[in-house]
């Protein structure tokens, strides 16, 4: 597929596309597609980059993306379209059983994908899509072809055992923004040899060590932080009636990046991201339509 109307404000979600099989039914998801969808709701050109199978689920994935008016570059490959069994606990918090050997493990770096990279204003990727070497190499090639001023967001998204210290290190070197949650921060602290530091000191350490422009830390009901050199923003988490939390973090990241690209301050972008994420928690599935008050 040829991508039209690319400009320097293009927001790219790069990595897995899959069906979350929830107790209430199947929902199209995958953090990168969720990110692109939510960035797009804030008026930015956005595109999801992944791969789907030459199967009925692949057809359905592309149909649903079309239905949601989300542009995509997704080669059809000889692997099944990705699925995840999602179980929700009493608070609506998900656990995942992620099927292996699927299409998004085998994303090729095509000319169309290269063209998207060259025109990216922001790109968001995670650790999960790097579990297989084929997609990992394509992600690195994509990042290598982005403009110098591209917002490169590593939304770490640790899932099950699908990550290594080496993969995390490589992405930390390639990003200029890290998005992480409090549980992942504990894992990273243990992995990288500074488990004793408190939350804020861990964040300042990572920010400086990898020369990041920003570090976004979400702590569930305990609020969220954005750290930048010489600057810290904290926002409390609004109390809402939770339907499920699937995709809430991606809506946060998509909203935050879109706001930064539109010229909002870090504090303004952070505040809106918190409000949108809280709203998404009140809805079923990862890609609800946002009310106009959040997107105008």
What are these regions (language model features)?
Residues 115-116, 170-171, 208:
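Structural alpha-helical scaffold elements that stabilize or flank donor/cofactor-binding regions
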Residues 122, 126-201, 223:
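Conserved beta-alpha-beta core of the PfkB/ribokinase-like small-molecule kinase fold
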Residues 45, 151, 177, 213-214:
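Proline-centered loop/turn at the N-terminus of a beta-strand
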Residues 1-10, 192, 196-296:
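Conserved phosphate-binding/catalytic region of the ribokinase-like
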């Amino acid at each position: 597929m040829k991508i039209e109307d690319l400009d320097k404000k293009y927001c790219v979600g790069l990595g897995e596309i899959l069906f979350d099989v929830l107790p209430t039914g199947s929902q199209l998801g995958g953090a990168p597609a969720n990110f692109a969808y939510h960035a797009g709701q804030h008026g930015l050109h956005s595109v999801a980059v992944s791969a789907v199978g030459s199967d009925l689920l692949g057809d359905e994935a592309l149909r649903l993306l079309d239905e949601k008016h989300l542009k995509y570059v997704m080669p059809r490959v000889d692997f099944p379209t990705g699925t995840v069994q999602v179980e929700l606990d009493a608070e609506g918090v998900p656990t995942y059983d992620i099927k292996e050997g699927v299409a998004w493990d085998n994303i090729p770096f095509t000319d169309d994908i290269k063209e998207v990279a060259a025109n990216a204003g922001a790109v968001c990727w995670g650790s999960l899509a790097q579990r297989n070497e084929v997609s990992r190499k394509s992600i690195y090639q994509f990042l290598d072809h982005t403009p110098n001023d591209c917002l490169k967001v590593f939304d770490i998204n640790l899932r099950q055992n699908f990550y290594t210290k080496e993969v995390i290190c490589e992405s930390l070197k390639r990003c200029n923004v890290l998005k992480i949650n409090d549980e992942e921060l504990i894992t990273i602290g243990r992995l990288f040899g500074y488990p004793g530091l408190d939350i804020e000191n861990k964040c300042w350490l990572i920010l400086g060590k990898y020369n990041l422009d920003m570090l976004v830390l979400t702590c569930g009901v305990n609020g969220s932080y954005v750290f930048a050199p010489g600057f810290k923003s904290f926002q409390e988490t609004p109390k809402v009636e939770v339907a499920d939390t699937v995709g809430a973090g991606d809506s946060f990241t998509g909203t935050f990046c879109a706001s930064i690209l539109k010229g909002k301050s870090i504090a303004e972008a952070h505040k809106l991201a918190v409000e949108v994420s809280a709203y998404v928690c009140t809805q079923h599935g990862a890609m609800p339509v946002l009310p106009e008050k959040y997107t105008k």
